[in-house]
């Protein structure tokens, strides 16, 4: 699982700027699940080969008792609870404040590793400016500048030093001994645990009729028709007889971690509620992660034909970016429609890991060009010459030629459709990369 770093601090100390720096994004919202995260934003970061999740929070006032500040404090406490490391951000230029002391007092009781990031430290005499921050009792302040990128690598190195990162898997992607890691993802109460319980034939995961009653991701070994699986319930496990209250029961972090750790994601939708913003955000993250995906609409038996038609349109419109994914209709509680789900999952993984021969790719490419040439860009028309596979899971197809920087997105989608049709690829995203010759006259037309 990817480690989780939570950014905590009072308002206007530069947390969002640091978030953008760590995630190499100006967007500050990589996975903002509407209605669930409010003032918590989630993004992916990387230091070399080490990947992690960053949680950005709103300004933290631990003693707030009402209004928006109380809600923001609640959100921040939840971010701390689901994190592995807390990065406590302070403002060097403003010095230590009473709010900083309040936050430090809270963090000392949180039981988490805490790093003190002294932000806005560019161009300052660090020893003099940082000395006062020792009084917070958070250890040595680490001087950083979110705006200028100074000290970021040292901060991340300290944050990640205690984590063992997974070594590359020695088993080939198509090795029959390799289990397919399947993440069952979706909003609270769409039936994730019920579906897995039905598959396993036992209450291995405790399912209650209440949104979000499971908590931490759990992996369950499973075998069907000779194929090994590892099922991941992204909401997680709540053990029988152990009752606890969570500030917010649906854990976005666990969902993101499970998706990142999976080979195939089964995205579960609720037929009685249609496609929501939360569904679309989760689907978008799955696509960005490059994971194979199957859509399953649960509680299909609970809606009439008119509602089914509306739902189909909603899926086509709101999840158009997942049009490559098969859509299946099921009832987990009644065990209806579950058989085809397994075939779709196996097909999606087979498609994601399929080996595509260069001669066949090139033939399909040239046939597509003969059927429909790319549009001219001024005096030049892009010349597509040959293609080869650049990667698996998801499939990457690299196309070589001249003036390929002028190939439109629409034409790339056309080519993707031709490749998908020929190789019968279902349930996996596909990436097409264009590589032009440096000299447009280096290769003569054949």
Swiss-Prot record:
GO terms for molecular function: GTP binding; ribosome binding. Residues 3-167, 180-353 form the EngA-type G domain. Coiled coil: none annotated. The keyword Nucleotide-binding applies. GTP 2 binds at residues 186-193, 233-237, 298-301. Residues 354-438 form the KH-like domain. GTP 1 binds at residues 9-16, 56-60, 119-122. InterPro entries: G_ENGA, GTP-bd, GTPase_Der, KH_dom-like, KH_dom-like_a/b, P-loop_NTPase, Small_GTP-bd. PANTHER family: GTPASE DER. GTPase that plays an essential role in the late steps of ribosome biogenesis. Belongs to the TRAFAC class TrmE-Era-EngA-EngB-Septin-like GTPase superfamily. EngA (Der) GTPase family. HAMAP family: GTPase_Der (MF_00195). Associates with the 50S ribosomal subunit. This is GTPase Der. It comes from Methylibium petroleiphilum (strain ATCC BAA-1232 / LMG 22953 / PM1). The lineage of its organism: Bacteria, Pseudomonadati, Pseudomonadota, Betaproteobacteria, Burkholderiales. The gene is der.
